Amino acid sequence: MDKKYVYEFNEGDETMRELLGGKGANLAGMSKLGMPVPYGFTITTEACNQYYEDNETINDGIKAQIMEYLDLLEKKSGKKLGDEANPLLVSVRSGARASMPGMMDTILNLGMNKTVAETVATLTNNERFAYDSYRRFIQMYSDVVMGLSKKRFEEIIDEVKAERGITDDLDLNAEDMKKLVELFKAFYKNELKSEFPKEQLMGAIEAVFRSWNNPRAIYYRKMNDIPSSWGTAVNVQMMVFGNMGNDCGTGVAFTRNPSTGENKLYGEFLMNAQGEDVVAGIRTPQKIDQLKEVAPGAYDDFVAITKKLETHYRNMQDMEFTIEKGKLFMLQTRNGKRTAQAALKIACDMVDEGMITTDEALMMVEPKQLDSLLHPMFDADELKKAEPIASALPASPGAACGQIVFSAEEAIQEASRNHKVILVRLETSPEDIEGMHVSQGILTVRGGMTSHAAVVARGMGTCCVSGCGDINMHDDEGYFEINGVKYHRGDWISLDGSTGNIYGSAIKTVPASISGDFERFMNWADERRTLKVRTNADTPHDAKQAHEFGAQGIGLVRTEHMFFEGDRIKAVREMIVSKTAAQRRVALEKILPMQRSDFEGIYEAMQGLPVTIRYLDPPLHEFLPTNSYDITQLAKDMHIGLDELKSVISSLHEFNPMMGHRGCRLAISYPEIAEMQTTAVIQAALAVNERHPDWKIEPEIMIPLVGDVAELRYVKKVVCDVADKLIQESELDMKYHVGTMIEIPRAALLADEIAKEAEFFSFGTNDLTQMTFGFSRDDAGGFLQDYYDKKIFEQDPFAHLDQRGVGKLVKMATELGRSTRPNIKLGICGEHGGDPASIEFCHRVGLNYVSCSPYRVPIARLAAAQAAIKFDK
């Protein structure tokens, strides 16, 4: 038997989402429940994929099945497509398995032509309705199927209204509608040099398949991790009309409030209108509860159906309906999109109502949604009035409003005067850390979602919009330009880190409101998950923040970030330009108390929870100045000649610093650095243990960039010699642990050997991804877009762990490590530690913990619980 590509609504059910798409599956489900659903059929997602395999054509076999089901639809409805006596009109709508509202295309009133319009006018005794439906169809078909500009059709409508001296579409009469039909057809003919077609169904179905790959659908898929291989289904359904007269209408409603979660029907409707009128906002709709005055019978039926649907689907529903001559028809139901606050309230309320279990509640909330709860938000009313000047990548969520500055120094200076600033840069570097920290938000011209700016901003919970190519930078002259408009230093701008929108004025922000539902919901997540969640934190402030968000320790303290602050950088630079180990030790002695104080602060903030401290990782040249003024100043401070300093800087230059003199290689060349860091770690832990004996802190020392067990053995000896001596002298009983990062593929391949020396592994997936792919994270943004456009990659491997390649190394290292040290502790501390899909992978391969930015801790806690629910059955 030939493969089945088409299903009548009553042949399927809601479990068939993968094949019928969300809309088709739910239409089938509603039909099975005996609800008033207009007759129709669904063309499957497999037909969409076949369409692309057949070079964007619908093959004869699929066409034959479509015509067979059209014949069935005509028999059931008693109407025929294109028939003069009793014409059938249909809608052709998309329906992917994941909800993608507004991303793909819809065509209504298909089957309309001049003769059909005349018949409909006679049958309904409503000429205006017939020609209104006809002109809408020409407009939609021309736009969706033939690619003509929507805007020109709107202009033609405005011209006709102006001629008549009217402003409202409702005041257009039957003659006006006839005139619009002729004007629309003339525009169509003029643009496409052909008459408006009589055969329309296959063209419309092809257009919906094509819309799966329109730019906005591709962008939405990328944003929501929806694979392009899923395809969209197409639903062909008999039209019911909300625009036939005053006893007709159309509306959209939610079973609960999608903004607040309140258990009250929420929605809008319009009488004498078609579906898109409600969404388009041309006319102001009425609130749903007013429907009981206008159409009481339809309202009562609708309320009963909403209750039945929510109980059946065990989730808040978003529904579309039409009333034709007083009779209610259901056109769609789906799980409704909702704010994070609403999601938590609905989940908790439904558990209290006995409708769902706590496991179902946990699966109901999208982990990434929790992000928006933790950052300041724009005032919703103010945001509605604002118009974006540009849009770029939403790299770190939140709402930021401040005055433009162009350098980290300016940011620090202005912030010290209590001025709110937005740091605008071509790109950021580690030296900008302090300026970034004091800024309300960060806007970069270059860089992607995992650029330096994005990673650091997320870690700090600072709003960041990156990669805005529309900006022409003239920072030397104190301004940047977008679309010919100049924005000067000191001007107010606002950034929306959730959408990537940039606004040219100040928009009021309000603090994020975390409700009691949040704590209750997260407790359910913590009870369910087996994977521990730690944080990446470099300061006591970050550590405290993460602890409040529920972190169970720190998986990564990047000690180099501490070196960039204030006076410390001078001592670090002094150490770098020293010629002998003795000179280096003098400089390191200055850094020691600062590092020790930082570590004490972090231990205090974490109150006895485990803390993993990574030793110095970046190449030394990153700590040296790059502009001539700073170089001259450093030479003076160091009492050395300018040429001599330039020679040192030049000698540290590397062609490929990512794979150069960094990580454990620095500790091997300069063991005194590891000695100083060990002294700081152990002394800090001993001091805090003395103050809080019940905390029993056991420092975890992590050696970065190990590729061979001999490297680890050498550095470990340096660490243990210092640590053992200090502990012995203190006369306190304190354990410590030495482990390594697995971030070089060779280390993953030799993990069994390395585990003999390492008490724990932490997978540094940022570098492991770079080294496995051979991509530089800082440069990949320049060509990865081509990979996405050409469907070579669907996802950014720096944002979502590459499970097939990098993941295979992680799995291998996990198994090899445990083969020689069964109790080895395993975690992940790259950016992937906060990505739900990557967390699911970590759960599956049996890691002990994930570590992520403080503001991603709640996301990771929920994602870990969802992984346990999915895979521990």
Describe each region flagged by the PLM.
Residues 1-386, 413, 419-422, 429-434, ...:
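Nucleotide/phosphate-binding sheet-loop regions of phosphoryl- and nucleotidyl-transfer enzymes
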Residues 41, 445-447, 466-469, 557, ...:
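Short beta->alpha connector loops at strand-helix junctions that form conserved
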Residues 93, 514, 524-873:
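Conserved alpha/beta-domain cores
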Residues 212, 374-406, 520-526, 530-537, ...:
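Flexible inter-domain linker/hinge segments
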Residues 235, 405, 422-424, 443, ...:
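Structural motif
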Residues 327-329, 426-437, 441-443, 449-455, ...:
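Glycine-rich phosphate/ribose-binding loops and adjacent secondary-structure elements
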Residues 392-431, 482-520:
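Extended, non-globular alpha-helical segments
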